[in-house]
């Protein structure tokens, strides 16, 4: 069977090669921002162009391009789309039962102010879900809840994408950092510690920035005490846990500390002027619902948390290992014509080394986040006393609403894997290593590009981690800093990742309106990654002693 060795400068001039490699991304941007095409149309055009470039410019065999496309599409369906289907199904069950109205009233008993509700739900609760499950589920769940609480769909989706910036690096129990650390041979605690130091300021900024987007400086002034409590408690807990515990728990710990601290503070303080994004007058009549009904109303999300906690336990994961009790539920399909037949080339590997891509589609029927959410939905169905016929109707409605978002997600992941396996995405990253001492400024941009293309900080770190490390060594820079830059830069690209955009739009009923959401977030993402470039450069050249040394 033929082998394919990636080439990163197919035209013999790195900048010409970059220009060609950029074409699919530019087409995607133009499709959404200028031509206002639907997400699945933009994704299809981009993946089609990337496939043509992969074959004609990068000399990738057509069969390998086809397999890369199919693998990406399948990965988009399972586990990504399955997570979103399950999350929306859970939310819709709550609405169908009528208990969501009781939940809404209980939330509004904490505060009626939409600015603070976005912090509690989008930032605090969303960060907890990101720390536990990741994969877009937190955005879908929190955005849907905020719409139910009266915020507009576009607002809810956009603000939740921005709120999701702070916890992404430590998402899914720290996998983005631990996976990269293992791949590059650097202790995970060092990258975790440096990430916590840099994200301290990001985590402080994000809640205030969310309020600013909603209500300007007036909003910050009116809500400052509560937002400060949320931001500082989150940033402080994230800093301490990332520096002393490692990458696994900061996302969960910081979110819980912030959520509890803010909710307790709001028992004693409320903003004088209540802000409602829908322009309606703030009014709240204390409900006469029995406390048991309130507990039942919250039960879907309490059950979700409990199931997630179970799903991430080592003893539970061991059940799916070889010869484990539930190992039968794991299915593997290897793409024989590309698995271990696509090879990385220097400088992504050392000159005397060889690295290939194992391409195995893993269909984990039970051991996947989507199934944990779906199980929570089934248990919630019993607690909420939703009839089976109604639940089936809700599930069918969810699938119908998700048909175009599912197509979009599949095409986006196909685009990602065609770009990754052909070497197109690596060309973009490699060009930035030619910037010499300015590399520190562009280092976060590499992670940003990686997450834009793949939708995953983990994938970006695995894709570009070795490049960041080798470039740092050649430029005599602290490699922990550039590895951290890749991780943090990736978190800033999450809000414009086509995958994230598609998920958020699906959750709030804006399927086909991806261009509106993309325009809302792209400018902030670009500003943030530019600021991060300045921060990384300042650390590298002014205060390098704050970077943990590899012993």
Model-predicted segments: where are they?
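Juxtamembrane and boundary regions of transmembrane helices in multi-pass small-molecule transporters
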Residues: 2, 169-279, 488-551
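Structural signature of hydrophobic alpha-helical transmembrane segments
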Residues: 9-23, 76-80, 133-138, 189-204, ...
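Hydrophobic mid-bilayer segments of alpha-helices in multi-pass membrane transport proteins
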Residues: 20-29, 37-59, 81-87, 227, ...
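Membrane-embedded alpha-helical segments and adjacent helix-loop junctions characteristic
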Residues: 66-152, 385-471
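Juxtamembrane helix-boundary/capping and inter-helix hinge elements in multi-pass membrane proteins
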Residues: 95-100, 112-113, 146-155, 182-189, ...
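Alpha-helical transmembrane segments of multi-pass membrane proteins
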Residues: 115-127, 153-166, 187-207, 410-411, ...
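Re-entrant/interfacial helical elements at transmembrane boundaries that shape
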Residues: 137-145, 161, 174-185, 430, ...
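Transmembrane helical segments that form the transport core of multi-pass membrane transport proteins
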Residues: 281, 288-446
């Amino acid at each position: 069977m033929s082998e394919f060795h990636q080439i990163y400068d197919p035209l013999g001039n790195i900048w010409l090669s970059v220009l060609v490699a950029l074409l699919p991304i530019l087409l995607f941007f133009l499709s959404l921002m200028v031509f206002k095409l639907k997400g699945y149309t933009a994704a299809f055009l981009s993946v089609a162009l990337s496939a043509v470039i992969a074959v004609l410019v990068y000399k990738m065999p057509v069969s390998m391009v086809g397999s890369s496309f199919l693998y990406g599409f399948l990965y988009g369906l399972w586990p990504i789309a399955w997570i979103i289907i399950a999350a929306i199904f859970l939310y819709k069950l709550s609405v169908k039962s009528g208990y969501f109205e009781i939940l809404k009233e209980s939330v509004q008993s904490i505060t009626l102010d939409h600015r603070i509700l976005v912090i509690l739900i989008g930032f605090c609760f969303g960060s907890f879900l990101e720390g536990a499950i990741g994969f877009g589920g937190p955005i879908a769940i929190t955005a849907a809840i905020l719409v139910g609480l009266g915020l507009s769909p576009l607002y809810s989706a956009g603000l939740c994408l921005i709120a999701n910036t702070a916890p992404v690096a430590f998402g899914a129990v720290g996998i983005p950092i631990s996976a990269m650390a293992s791949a590059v041979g650097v202790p995970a605690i060092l990258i975790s510690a440096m990430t916590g130091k840099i994200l301290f300021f990001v985590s402080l900024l994000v809640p205030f920035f969310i309020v600013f987007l909603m209500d300007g400086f007036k909003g910050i002034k009116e809500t400052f005490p509560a937002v400060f409590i949320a931001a500082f408690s989150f940033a402080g807990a994230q800093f301490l846990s990332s520096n002393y515990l490692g990458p696994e728990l900061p996302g969960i710990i910081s979110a819980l500390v912030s959520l509890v601290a803010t909710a307790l503070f709001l028992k004693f303080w409320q903003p004088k002027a209540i802000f409602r994004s829908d322009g309606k007058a703030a009014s709240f009549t204390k409900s006469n619902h029995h406390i048991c009904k309130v507990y039942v109303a919250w039960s879907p999300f309490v059950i979700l948390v409990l199931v997630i906690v179970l799903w991430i336990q080592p003893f539970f994961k061991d059940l799916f290992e070889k010869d484990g009790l539930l190992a039968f539920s794991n299915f593997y399909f290897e793409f024989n014509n590309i698995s271990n037949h696509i090879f990385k080339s220097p400088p992504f590997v050392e000159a005397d080394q060889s690295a290939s891509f194992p391409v195995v589609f893993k269909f984990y029927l039970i051991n996947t986040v989507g199934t944990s959410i779906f199980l929570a939905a089934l248990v919630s169905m019993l607690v909420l006393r939703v009839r089976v016929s109604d639940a089936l109707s809700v599930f069918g409605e969810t699938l119908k609403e998700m048909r175009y978002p599912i197509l979009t997600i599949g095409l986006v992941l196909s685009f990602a894997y065609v770009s990754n396996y052909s070497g197109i995405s690596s060309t973009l990253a490699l060009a930035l290593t030619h910037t010499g001492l300015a590399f520190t400024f562009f280092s976060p941009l590499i992670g940003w590009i990686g997450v834009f293309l793949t939708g995953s900080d983990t994938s970006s770190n695995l894709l570009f981690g070795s490049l960041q490390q080798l470039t740092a060594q050649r430029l005599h820079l602290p490699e922990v800093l550039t590895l951290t830059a890749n991780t943090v830069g990736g978190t800033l690209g999450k809000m414009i990742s086509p995958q994230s955009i598609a998920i958020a739009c699906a959750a709030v009923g804006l399927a086909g309106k991806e261009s509106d959401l993309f325009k809302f977030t792209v400018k902030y993402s670009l500003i943030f990654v530019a600021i991060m470039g300045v921060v990384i450069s300042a650390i590298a050249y002014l205060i390098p002693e704050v970077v943990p040394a590899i012993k």
